[in-house]
Amino acid sequence: SPAFDDEHNDNFLRL
């Protein structure tokens, strides 16, 4: 999954 993905961002923290 991409780093910045609105629907599925598992690489970055969801703030």
From Swiss-Prot:
Entry keyword Amino-acid biosynthesis: no
Coiled-coil intervals: none
A Gene Ontology biological process term: neuropeptide signaling pathway
GO cellular component term, pick one: extracellular region
Record's keyword terms, sorted: Amidation, Neuropeptide, Secreted
UniProt keyword Secreted present: yes
Leucine amide PTM sites in chain numbering: L15
Subcellular localization: Secreted
Domain of life: Eukaryota
Stated family: Belongs to the FARP (FMRF amide related peptide) family.
Summary of the function given for this chain in its UniProt record: FMRFamides and FMRFamide-like peptides are neuropeptides.
Protein name in UniProt: Extended FMRFamide-12
Source species: Lobatophasma redelinghuysense
Classification lineage: Eukaryota, Metazoa, Ecdysozoa, Arthropoda, Hexapoda
